[in-house]
Amino acid sequence: MASIIFSAKDIFEQEFGREVRGYNKVEVDEFLDDVIKDYETYAALVKSLRQEIADLKEELTRKPKPSPVQAEPLEAAITSSMTNFDILKRLNRLEKEVFGKQILDNSDF
């Protein structure tokens, strides 16, 4: 991971040599002020994210690890729902068979 070369204070205290045809000092200072604000914002964001990572890691260590026993009720529920679905399909076929014949018998009148 790359290390940070400049801090906000380093940027603020940086001095530049002066030449006759140099940059506008006020513009450079304003730009560097904005860069300092960005550095401070990024530093605060990094600190906040590191704290959040630490909190989440701590929360993860406090939670109990899931055991294989917990998977069994889920498998039972899936099997049960498949069984219920099969029963409903069978009931549907039987109803069609019974009520379908009644409809055909009633249409003969």
UniProtKB/Swiss-Prot annotation:
It comes from the Bacteria. InterPro entries: Cell_cycle_GpsB, DivIVA_domain, DivIVA_fam. The keyword Cytoplasm applies. GO terms for biological process: cell division; peptidoglycan-based cell wall biogenesis; regulation of cell shape. Residues 36-63 form a coiled coil. One of its GO terms (cellular component) is cytoplasm. It holds the Pfam family DivIVA. The keyword Cell division applies. Keywords: Cell cycle, Cell division, Cell shape, Coiled coil, Cytoplasm. It is found in: Cytoplasm. Belongs to the GpsB family. Divisome component that associates with the complex late in its assembly, after the Z-ring is formed, and is dependent on DivIC and PBP2B for its recruitment to the divisome. Together with EzrA, is a key component of the system that regulates PBP1 localization during cell cycle progression. Its main role could be the removal of PBP1 from the cell pole after pole maturation is completed. Also contributes to the recruitment of PBP1 to the division complex. Not essential for septum formation. Forms polymers through the coiled coil domains. Interacts with PBP1, MreC and EzrA. This is Cell cycle protein GpsB. It comes from Streptococcus pneumoniae (strain ATCC BAA-255 / R6).
